[in-house]
Amino acid sequence: EMTSSLVGSEMCIRDSYRTDNHGKGSWYSINGNIDYQRTSRKNKERMITLSYKINSQPQTNDSYNTYLDIEPDENKLDIIKELSLKNFHSDGKTNTMEQTFQVDYTTPIGKLHTIETGAKYIFRRNSSDNRFYEAEGASENYAYNENRSSEYRHLNHILSAYAGYTLKYKGFTFKPGLRYEQTIQEVKYLVGPGENFDSNFSDLVPSVSLGIKLGKTQNLRGGYNMRIWRPGIWNLNPYFDDQNPMFISQGNPDLKSEKSHAFDVAYSSFSAKFNVNVSLRHSFNNNGIERISRLITAEDGEDFGGGHIAPHGALYSTYDNIGKNRNTGLSLYLNWNASPKTRIYVNGRGSYTDMKSEAQGLHNYGWNGSFYGGIQHTLPLKLRLSLNGGGSTPYISLQGKGSGYQYYGLS
């Protein structure tokens, strides 16, 4: 509860009122899963696994904001009108429900080969119903306000299937794989701003890895993988938001999934005295989702269809797959057990980043590095003394550089 007062020019209280906020809400999480696995009697490494999982998170929120004791009483109606004092009541319900069905099958072929395959289906439903009611200050005659209310349904159908093959021969391992993913989205806005739309994404995601044992304590591995990021609802929604007619925004339902490609090579060596891991990684993305803005220069404005016209001089913003990003990095981890009671460790990383946004006319690149390390020593009575420190150079962003840091500690 809060009290507000308005002071006049003669430093006396002109009017005052109290604000009362109260409400109640609930939050639940419901989880469950069932798994079934069957192993072949002839070969224990041949198996099939069936899985089902469900998760639901219903929430409710019922809140009131009320103006009380509006004084002076003889000016109550004028005060309510001048200060736009409106009691409001918000009654909201949301729920996220997800069900996952999955099957996995693994079988060896001879002594050297293994095949893995499987499929997964995810059904995800997000729903929200938030009703907003208003009344003039000091009144309880609440009226439904559709403009400030919202109700929507987001349905996601995610289907994926994968196949993988593994070859193991002495110290050599070769493992290629391929995954197919399809996402179907259905978005409906029953109340409030927003435009109904559907989207469909289909992606093939390959991967491959190689591993070689160089003796009993050394390994060399390399590989390639691709990761995908799908655009969010706000990126896709074609709703023409011209609440401010000079600053217009609209999603792009034709966006594609972002695809990031990564190659890496790593060497590791482990022994009682030394542990070493060195890795080199290069990644790039040629279709990053970027927000693009442009001025409407046509004297008569620009027609975007559906009766939507952006006036001359307005700033129109949407999204497109035009971002580019490249990064090459080298990392090192070293652990040396100098004595039974002393351990020295070092962890460092250096990378070169190149980022470009054609829509914004921005291009930035540069080096970045980070390091931390320390010494640990065990004292008598099993007390442990630790000295550590580290730092980082400024990181590279599209519009400049961030801040670096350094630290040290003794414990």
Q: Which residues make up each language-model segment?
A:
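Single conserved hydrophobic/aromatic residue that forms the stacking wall/gate
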Residues: 2-8, 12-13
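Structural signature of Gram-negative outer-membrane beta-barrels, strongest in the C-terminal barrel
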Residues: 92-102, 106-127, 144-275, 279-285, ...
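Outer-membrane beta-barrel proteins
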Residues: 25, 43-45, 58-63, 126-130, ...
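Conserved C-terminal beta-signal and adjacent last beta-strands/turns
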Residues: 364-411
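Residues that define the transmembrane beta-barrel architecture of outer-membrane proteins
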Residues: 26-30, 95-99, 155-159, 200-204, ...
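Extracellular loop and loop/strand-boundary signature of outer-membrane beta-barrel proteins
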Residues: 15-22, 35-37, 84-91, 144-151, ...
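Outer membrane beta-barrel strand-and-loop segments of large Gram-negative receptors
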Residues: 98-102, 143-150, 250-252, 256, ...
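Face-selective signature of the C-terminal outer-membrane beta-barrel domain
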Residues: 21-188, 277-278, 326-351
